[in-house]
């Protein structure tokens, strides 16, 4: 079962996303800000969904700290919608960026896509550790 951490300071949004993802069969933990998210994070999470504008520690700063120790996919979910904001989200290590308000279908689609990419990455690591050889194909 996939384990997802939601880092969001708005209780209504946090609980709505939690319920939506649980109905899809995911195990979901919540954190109320960036500091809380960093305390709760461990490598058993398959995905982190994170707001950017939060008290104590922004999502941007929390992402920077997570990237020092982990490659877990991070989906920013935020009201910040300028091109500069989006670019900054990717530059600090975010894997996807969704602007509020968002549709439930779009969120679920992006979560599934990030988890599929994570599965491919994890399989490649396992295969590589098993000593399998890869052929680099250049089209």
Where do the model's predicted regions map?
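Short, Lys/Arg-enriched segments at the junction into DNA-binding effector domains
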Residues: 3, 113-139
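Conserved acidic carboxylate
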Residues: 8
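Two-component/phosphorelay signaling modules centered on CheY-like receiver
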Residues: 11-29
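Acidic, metal-coordinating helix/loop segments flanking the phosphotransfer/catalytic sites
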Residues: 30-47
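Acidic catalytic/metal-coordinating carboxylates
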Residues: 33-36, 58-62, 85
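Receiver (REC) domain active-site loop signature in two-component systems and cognate sites
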Residues: 52-55, 81
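C-terminal output helix
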Residues: 82, 102-115
């Amino acid at each position: 079962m996939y384990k997802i951490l939601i880092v969001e300071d708005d209780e209504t949004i946090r609980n709505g996303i939690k319920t939506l993802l649980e109905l899809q069969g995911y195990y979901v933990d919540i954190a109320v800000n960036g500091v809380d998210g960093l305390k709760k994070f461990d490598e058993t999470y398959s995905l982190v969904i994170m707001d950017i504008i939060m008290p104590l520690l922004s999502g941007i700063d929390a992402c920077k700290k997570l990237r020092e120790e982990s490659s877990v996919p991070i989906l920013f979910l935020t009201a910040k919608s300028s091109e500069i904001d989006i670019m900054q989200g990717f530059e600090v290590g975010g894997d996807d960026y969704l602007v509020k308000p968002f549709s439930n279908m779009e969120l679920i689609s992006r979560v599934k896509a990030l988890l599929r990419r994570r599965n491919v990455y994890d399989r490649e690591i396992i295969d590589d550790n098993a000593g399998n050889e890869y052929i680099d194909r250049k089209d």
